[in-house]
Amino acid sequence: MDTRVAMISIVVENQGDIEKLNQILHEYGSYIIGRMGLPYPKRNISLISVTVDAPADKISAMTGKIGMLKGITSKALYAKLQEGCSEETD
């Protein structure tokens, strides 16, 4: 299956749906390469960066679900790599 490498940026302005956000990230956990979260108390927000290697439709579905959460926004930035297979070959 062809996959894309992408960075998903998430801004959490409302902590109310953070549990739902974590459920979504868990749902797509098999595609996640890494995740970094930074709280920013001065502005009362959290910034999360998630790196994925997944089919484009899965990335779109994940960012769409995250974007529907109240007070949480997300955007995906795709690497300019050719689509690749997630399975290793000899």
Language-model features: where?
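Long, contiguous binding/interaction regions
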Residues: M1-D90
